[in-house]
């Protein structure tokens, strides 16, 4: 009986394990590439955006856009008298 006694399924299992390892490595490389690309896009948009005095910028992926226009708090902040109603 030899030390290298292989069954027919050993080669199939080895090929499957190698393919899974190659796929995992490819997914890791693709994920890193996409992450770096998103960082580059986010950085270029941050440099192009203009921020007024006292305002803070939201992170790129957390900015929510609305078709209705500015929110109520921002409109109230822009009016000179504030949100109170005068009669």
Swiss-Prot record:
GO terms for cellular component: membrane; mitochondrial outer membrane. The modification Phosphoserine is found at residue 49. One of its GO terms (molecular function) is metal ion binding. InterPro entries: SNN_cytoplasm, SNN_linker, SNN_transmemb, Stannin, Stannin_sf. Its main location: mitochondrion. Residues 32-87 are cytoplasmic. The keyword Phosphoprotein applies. The chain crosses the membrane at residues 11-31. It is a single-pass membrane protein. The keyword Phosphoprotein applies. Residues 1-10 are mitochondrial intermembrane. Pfam families: SNN_cytoplasm, SNN_linker, SNN_transmemb. It comes from the Eukaryota. Keywords: Membrane, Mitochondrion, Mitochondrion outer membrane, Phosphoprotein, Transmembrane, Transmembrane helix. It is found in: Mitochondrion outer membrane. Belongs to the stannin family. Monomer. Plays a role in the toxic effects of organotins. Plays a role in endosomal maturation. PANTHER family: STANNIN. This is Stannin. The lineage of its organism: Eukaryota, Metazoa, Chordata, Craniata, Vertebrata. The gene is SNN.
């Amino acid at each position: 009986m030899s030390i290298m006694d292989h069954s027919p399924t050993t080669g199939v299992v080895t090929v499957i394990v190698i393919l899974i390892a190659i796929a995992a490595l490819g997914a890791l490389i693709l994920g890193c590439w996409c992450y770096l690309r998103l960082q580059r896009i986010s950085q270029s948009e941050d440099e192009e955006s203009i921020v007024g005095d006292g305002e803070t910028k939201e992170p790129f992926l957390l900015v929510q856009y609305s078709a209705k226009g500015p929110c109520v708090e921002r409109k109230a902040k822009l009016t000179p008298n504030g949100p109170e109603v005068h009669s």
